[in-house]
Regions:
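A short alpha-helical cap/connector motif
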Residues: 1-134, 141-162, 167-206
Length: 206
């Protein structure tokens, strides 16, 4: 399902071509070891569209992204923010990734919709006041639990957290299971896992 805006679609298509090329390169026999920082590691088209639909459907104006990477999901969230009149606050450890994401957002005409914070996401989260209507959690998986502890009090009633990589890669499944268990014990969260992309947990605060 395409977005209405062809400019945004072209930017997303560029990301998706890069992701396909990365997959082909790493799948080739004898491919050398790679630095994960060089890869998009994006949520993919289906999850991206779901992020857009969930955040626009809920008219989310205060959107938080934990893990900008190169900006694929940021473009989806910024497109949603433009639709709702909102803003995205995006956190990323690596400055060079933020710069790459900025360039993509500029090409998409969405740069005014995103505010970036560089540095450790836990340190940054402590400085953000919230409340947030919509949160995407897509950082290193050992950070999911501490991120949830900091985000949960800042989530608005009716606010949604989407956490990626609940099923894949298999090596992070223990952390994913621990995250899901914690969310479901929170007492004020309704939560479901969806088998799309690499598996996502969608959680809503009552």
């Amino acid at each position: 399902m395409p977005l209405v805006d062809p400019v945004i679609e072209r930017v997303l298509a560029d990301f998706e071509r890069r992701a396909e090329e990365e997959q082909r390169r790493t799948a080739a026999p004898g491919s050398p070891g790679t630095n994960l920082d060089d890869f998009l590691l994006s949520v993919g088209r289906d999850v991206g569209m779901l992020l857009y639909l969930l955040s626009t459907g809920a008219q989310s104006r205060r959107i938080l992204e934990l893990g900008t990477s190169y900006g694929y999901s940021t473009v989806w969230l910024a497109a949603a923010a433009r639709s709702t009149g909102g803003k995205v606050t995006s956190l990323e450890l690596r400055e060079f990734k933020i710069e790459s994401a900025r360039q993509a957002l500029t090409r998409a005409g969405l740069s005014s919709r995103v505010e970036f914070h560089a540095g450790d996401c836990l340190d940054t989260l402590k400085t953000l006041s919230g409340p947030f209507d919509f949160v995407l959690l897509d950082v290193w998986k050992d950070l999911y639990l501490p991120c949830f502890e900091l985000v949960h009090p800042k989530l608005a009633p009716g606010g949604v957290i989407v956490a990626d990589n609940m099923l894949l890669p298999a090596m992070v499944r223990p952390q994913a299971e621990a995250y899901r268990a914690r969310v479901r014990k929170a007492g004020d969260m309704d939560s479901v896992m969806l088998d799309i992309g690499n598996g996502i947990e969608v959680s809503r605060k009552r």
